Amino acid sequence: RQKKAMEMFGFPKENCFDSALELSRVPKFADAVINGTMDEQHVETSIPLLKKGYDMLLEKPFATNEKEMRELVSCVKENGNKVMISHVLRYTPFYLSIKERVASGEIGDIINIQTCEHVSYHHLSTSYVRGKWANSDVCHTSMLLAKCCHDIDLMMWMMSDTQPSMISSFGSKFQFKPENAPKEAGTKCLVDCPLVDTCRYSAKRLYLDQPKRWAFYIWDKLEGIENPTDEDRINLLKGDSNYGRCIYKCDNNVVDHQSVLVNFKNGATGTHNMVGGSAGPMRRIHIIGTKGEIYGDFEESKFTVAKIHPTKTDEKTVEVVDLNVNGDMVGAYGGHGGGDEKLAADFVEFLRGGKPSLACTSIFDSVA
């Protein structure tokens, strides 16, 4: 990967390193770094670079436990770095537009906020059953923190004038466990399973028949092959690839659905529901205020503003806002529904000392 990056972007060999620690041992030669390592590596890779004087755009969640969170915040305070957290969905036209309407007071004070995320069956099985975030002993994070820190952050952002006073949550590993496996199921889809052509979670159907789906996860071990063939892919899934395992017989220990209930200090409430294994991806939000409500679907990139109006025949005014931007992964405005590009631009402005945008999240905002 390092060699490929050198070729793509023209990096000189002396500016390529095998670790953050190795980078920290040479004289500082840039203003900032972008830390996009795995969740459990965020703190250990950030601290040497922060001590070296680099500012940073840090992927969320910026820490996976309270001890490391406090350690990182303390390091930033001691060294005076500018650290921005990559809460990219704040920058999407969908959520930013909703935040602006809420901040204007248009729907009054928020009484209740409801968010939900449905994780599609192929995303859940690839990332959270067979993949990198399937086992908390390996990735050192929970399903909620890994997948839904976006949604929890959005709830806190919309409720920025108050803080939680009490939180309760529960969930379970409902679907993907050995006792739910069909009796005929093998242990490896392409090796010993007679259901390889019919199971909806078959590695053949999910990955070989759709080789571009989640390719950056599934075929990562083939990166050294310039033009991998179908035979290369089959052999990988038959071999030691985690993605060739029976979906019901993996080492996953994270939940596949979870609900969260939040009570805020001002008396408002919030809920978040994460459900994995749905037919398609979905993120929704519904905010009810004292003057009206806002609700919408991120994937559809449209939301409705309904305001109380006693003299209207239907007792309310309704405005549908269609932003005409595709959802999470693709779109006319780039990845994450248009958020990626705006996040990068805001980070540059953040480094220059400009006025923070409504969406900007410093590390201190994240622990407030």
Question: What function would you assign to each model-found segment?
Answer:
Residues 1-11, 155:
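N-terminal Rossmann-like dinucleotide-binding module
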Residues 9-75:
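Beta-loop-alpha module in the N-terminal Rossmann-like domain of NAD(P)-dependent dehydrogenases
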Residues 35, 58-59, 64, 83-85, ...:
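Hydrophobic residues in well-ordered beta-strands that form the structural core
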Residues 39, 43, 68-71, 90-92, ...:
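Catalytic cores of eukaryotic secretory-pathway lumenal/extracellular enzymes that build
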Residues 71-88, 108-115:
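Rossmann-fold dehydrogenase core element
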